[in-house]
């Protein structure tokens, strides 16, 4: 979410927050905090979500930062739409993910954490696009944000903006309806 904030602070970028979350909750039946509100707020139809995310960038922006969670792609869905994007995987150490996730919701199994799905997604993106997705560790961004954001921007052939390093404290209109449950730390950052 902090990465989404970083990109949202650019003047040329529109962000969307976890567009497949309602689909995931609907499909799996998992009882996450605010589940019914999420399902009411977003489409639960895979095709509608794909149509949205491959459509025109809203507000005539040049960049569309889409925050996805790998485990929201449940099983076997067609993800050929990744060919329209510059793909990037943000990874975190399992210990950090487990601690963070468990504070918000019970862990039903390894699939909740997304590691197996990340490996599969990495391979699928390579097969569909012909190139490996850009992968970086969240710890690197936290340790030296400017250095790693510059590396990322260079890789994606976009200009780095110092605005990516700071953002106003508080929630955003672009935050998912689930933000009160999951985003406390980033809202206060």
Show where each model-derived region lies:
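Glycine-rich phosphate-binding loop used to anchor ATP phosphates in small-molecule kinases
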Residues: 52-77
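PAPS-dependent sulfotransferase catalytic domain
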Residues: 69-163, 175-187
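Short, well-ordered alpha-helix to beta-strand connector turns
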Residues: 10, 61, 84-85
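Small-residue-rich helix-loop
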Residues: 168-169
């Amino acid at each position: 979410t902090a990465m989404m904030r970083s990109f949202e602070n650019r003047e040329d970028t529109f962000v969307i927050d976890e567009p497949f979350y309602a689909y995931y909750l609907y499909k799996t039946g998992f009882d996450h905090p605010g589940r019914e509100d999420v399902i009411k707020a977003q489409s639960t139809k895979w095709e509608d979500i794909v149509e949205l995310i491959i459509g025109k960038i809203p507000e005539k922006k040049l960049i569309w930062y889409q925050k996805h969670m790998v485990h929201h792609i449940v099983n076997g869905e067609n993800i050929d739409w990744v060919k329209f994007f510059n793909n990037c995987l943000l990874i975190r150490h399992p210990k950090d993910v487990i601690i963070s996730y468990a504070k918000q919701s019970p862990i039903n199994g390894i699939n909740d954490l997304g590691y197996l799905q990340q490996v599969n997604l990495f391979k699928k993106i390579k097969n569909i696009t012909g190139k490996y997705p850009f992968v970086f560790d969240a710890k690197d961004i936290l340790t030296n944000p400017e250095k790693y954001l510059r590396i990322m921007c260079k890789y994606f052939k976009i200009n780095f903006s110092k605005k990516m390093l700071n953002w106003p404290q508080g929630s955003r209109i672009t935050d998912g309806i689930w933000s009160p449950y999951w985003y406390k730390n980033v809202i206060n950052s």
